[in-house]
Amino acid sequence: MNTDSYVQFFRQTSPYIHAHRGKTFVIALGGDAIAHGNCHRTLHDIALLQSLGIRLVLIHGARPQIDKRLALSSIDTSFAQQLRITDSEAMLCVKEAVGSTRLIIESELSMGLPNSPMHGAQLTVVGGNFMAAKPVGVRNGIDFQNTGEVRRIDADAIEQQLVLGSMVLMSPIGFSPTGESFNLNYQDVAAHVAIALDAEKLILVSQAGGIMTDGNLLRNLSLPEVNRLKENSTNGSEQSLLACAYRACNNGVDRVHLVSCAEDGALLSELFTREGSGTLIMKDHSEVIRPATIDDVGGILDLISPLEDQQVLVKRSRELLETEISRFMVVVHPEGL
C-alpha cells in the first residue's frame, strides 16, 4: 500500500474507530479457527481491537483439539442434538485439550517482539469462574453425562475486569455449585455472555465464516431470514452459527457478525470497512430516510465531492450546503455508523 492509499484508508476507518471505542464486543473463536494456520494473525488482530479501546471478552472453542486428544487416548464419543456426550473418561481429555488451547491463545496475546504486530501491546488477559454451569441431563432418552450448559453468567465480575482494561478470556468448561465440571458449547457460552453484558456486538469467528447461498455471500440478514435459514439448513456447523446468532440478536445484542478465520484480515475488514467481509445479522436492517441536518453537511460533502470533480454535479460550497440543508434528505444505512 502506498502512502496516499494508506492515508486514505486510515481516514476512512477513523469513524469506525471512534464509534467502537468503549464498546463491548464478545468474540467467539472456534477451535477450528485456533487450529487454522492463520490463527496467530487473527489473535493479533484481536489484540489490535483491544488497543483501540474496545472492551473485549474472548470465548474459545476446542472441538478439533478435543477430537485429537480423544483419538490419542483411543476413546470414542458420540454426538446427539449437536452436542458431544461426555462421560467421565472423555471429560479428562476435554480438560486437557481446553487447557492447552487456552495456553496457546494466552501465549499469542502475550507476545511483544520488536517489529511484530504485538510489539508494545502489553495486554492483560484474565480468566476466572465467571459462569456457573449445570448438566444438560437426559434429553429424548439420551444421558449427556458431563456435557453441560450455562446456568448463570457473573456479568458484574466480568464488567469489573473490563473497567480495569483487561481482556477477559473464557473457556468452554463450566462448574456447578457442587464443584462438578461440565463440557460446554462455546457458542452457547458466547451468546449467554453477550446477552448478560448487553454487548454491542457478538462476533463468531470460524472456518465457516459468513453464510453462503449458491456460492454468494449473504452480507446482511434479518432475524426472520436467520430463522428460515436455520430451519432449512442441512449443514450442522451453519445451523449452530445461525442458532447462536438468533439467540443473541433476539435477546438484546445489537449486531452479530459471522467472520471467516481463513481470510487474512477478515475481522478488521468486517469492523472497519463499509463493505465488511462476512455476514451481519441485525434485528432490523431496513434503511431509514430522514431530513438532513446541519450535522450531515460534512458527510454530504464527502459523498458529492467525487461527482463534482467528474462534473456530474454542480460544485457546491459548504456555505451553500448549510444554507440549503433543509432541501436534502439522507438515507441511513444499517451497516453505517
Language-model-derived ranges and their functions:
Residues 24-28, 57, 137, 167-174, ...:
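Structural motif
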Residues 71-169:
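Ligand-binding beta-strand-loop-alpha-helix segment within the catalytic cores
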Residues 308-334:
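Active-site rim helix/loop that mediates acceptor-substrate recognition in acyltransferases
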Residues 1-58:
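N-terminal glycine-/serine-/threonine-rich phosphate-binding loop
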Residues 284-315:
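Short amphipathic alpha-helix that is part of the acyltransferase structural core
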Residues 197-215, 258-259:
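Glycine-rich phosphate/pyrophosphate-binding loops
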Residues 38-44, 68-77:
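Glycine-rich loop at the start of a catalytic domain that most often binds anionic cofactors/ligands
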Residues 86-117, 155-156, 169-195, 218-267:
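Polyanion-binding loop/helix "lid" in catalytic or ligand-binding cores
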